[in-house]
Regions:
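Histidine-centered divalent metal-coordination motifs
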Residues: 45, 135-136
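Hydrophobic, well-ordered secondary-structure segments
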Residues: 90-123, 133, 160-177
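Hydrophobic/aromatic-lined pockets within catalytic cores
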Residues: 139, 152-159, 243, 257-262, ...
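Non-catalytic, low-complexity flexible loops and terminal extensions
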Residues: 1-9, 85-87, 94, 138, ...
Length: 423
């Protein structure tokens, strides 16, 4: 089985694309049990049995050679489970920060089916701490949440159900459809595609180019992560104000950061696009953005209400909410690769440099990007085990600067701020 990579193309050559989640499991665990649970969970998702194929003409696919007609919802058994490719769990005594700082610089071998790694870095009689690292082509933030749920179910002895890939299609991209869906901006991909195909003669890239990009970028950069555990009483206070002001928690947090930033900012938001509420592993997210400067002549409440209005306007407009999907898919796939390589510093061309500048892949990136997973729709307890800590660290994608991740599991609300700095 093959699935064309369309709306996820910008993740392919991005050099900072690892989604991280760290958890603490309360309960008597052992290495063999954790290994077995991880292997069972990887068998439950079709995408984790795939590899990414790059053709010479620049097209890219998820390819599952082990697909034997498994159906959504069927129990995962030894007779119908796919082979676990290169998704592994490791055990070491280290800090999670050291692990993440080391691993985000190492390219996932997606051509060999490596999408997911887990590192158990603490273990004692009371439980263990694990950090899960996933390439964004393995799925979005919710995908990793659902994988962790499956991992915990398997750890407690529960049988898992098989989950197929569900990708967001780019939809029709002919000239008329682009004009209808993109409006006046339809000329942008059309113009740049023409320049790219003329100047670069349909140049395409391969995994060697990807290796060079990682080496070039990470020898001059490193990430910093700030993690804030928000006490339940503080969360309740903020939620009370949100209810009183008729705003969301995301708008409240955004306003707080805008007050700190002190200037007009371009803020991006990841938006869940799972219309049917499925729990598959795949990229099923879109995005919106707003621009706003905190007005110090007005109260925090007034600023927060304005931020919420700007967000709501975009979220209630289906065309605005979906815009980024057909827009990015309208560019030549190899040109999308090229702007990521421009960002990494390993490739230069007049066309890709110009487009990278316009789209914020160079110096003028988004000031802030927020992903709020809200209250996670997974249990805390799994038999004798309990997830009593959960933290979500989104990647600093090529067009981002200050990346904020928010998650709540039970009484545990954690906010992270992920940034990249030059060294």
């Amino acid at each position: 089985m093959r699935y064309m990579i369309e709306t996820e193309r910008s993740d392919l050559f991005d050099v900072s694309i690892v989604i991280a989640m760290r958890v603490h499991i309360k309960g008597n665990v052992n290495e063999d049990g954790l290994r077995s649970a991880f292997e069972e969970a990887t068998k439950a998702y079709e995408i984790l049995g795939c590899r990414v194929v790059l053709e010479e003409d620049g097209t890219a696919y998820y390819e599952n050679e082990n697909f034997e007609g498994q159906k959504e919802g069927n129990p995962v058994t030894s007779s119908n489970s796919q082979k676990c490719r290169n998704n592994k769990i490791f055990f070491e005594e280290s800090s999670w920060r050291q692990i993440l700082k080391r691993e985000e610089k190492i390219r996932f071998k997606i051509e060999e089916g490596e999408f997911l790694k887990a590192f158990c870095y603490e273990m004692n009689e009371e439980g263990c701490s694990i950090i899960f690292l996933m390439h964004h082509l393995g799925g979005d933030g919710k995908s990793l949440v659902y994988f962790i749920e499956s991992f915990m179910k398997a750890l407690s002895g529960e049988k898992l159900e098989y989950s197929n890939i569900r990708l967001i299609s780019a939809g029709p991209l002919d000239d008329k459809s682009q004009r209808d869906r993109l409006g006046p901006l339809a000329f942008v991909p059309k113009s740049y595609n023409k320049k790219w195909n003329k100047d670069e003669r349909k140049k395409s890239f391969n995994y060697s180019d990807m290796d060079e990009a990682y080496e070039t970028y990470w020898k001059e950069h490193e990430s910093t992560i700030d993690e804030y555990i928000i006490k339940p009483e503080k969360v309740n206070m903020m939620l009370g104000k949100c209810k009183e002001w008729n705003i969301g928690f995301t708008a409240y947090i955004t306003t707080a950061f805008l007050r700190w930033l002190g200037r007009k900012a371009d803020v991006g938001y990841a938006v869940d696009y799972r219309k049917d509420g499925n729990r598959c592993m795949s990229n099923q997210a879109t995005g919106i953005s707003i621009k706003y400067a905190y007005n110090y002549n007005k109260s925090f409440q007034e600023n927060a209400i304005k931020v919420q209005k700007l967000m709501t306007k975009k979220l209630e407009d289906e065309q605005s909410k979906e815009f980024i999907l057909p827009f990015m898919a309208s560019f030549e796939p190899t040109l999308v690769d090229a702007i990521n390589l421009e960002h990494a510093g390993s490739f230069r061309s007049k066309t890709s440099k110009s487009l990278a500048t316009i789209l914020g892949y160079r110096k003028k990136t988004k000031d802030m990007s927020v992903t709020n997973l809200t209250k996670l729709d997974i249990p805390e307890e799994y038999g004798e085990y309990k997830l009593d800590f959960f933290s979500f660290i989104p990647p600093v994608i090529s067009y981002g600067k200050n990346i904020i991740g928010i998650s709540t599991l039970g009484d545990c609300t954690v906010l992270t701020l992920h940034r990249i700095k030059k060294v």
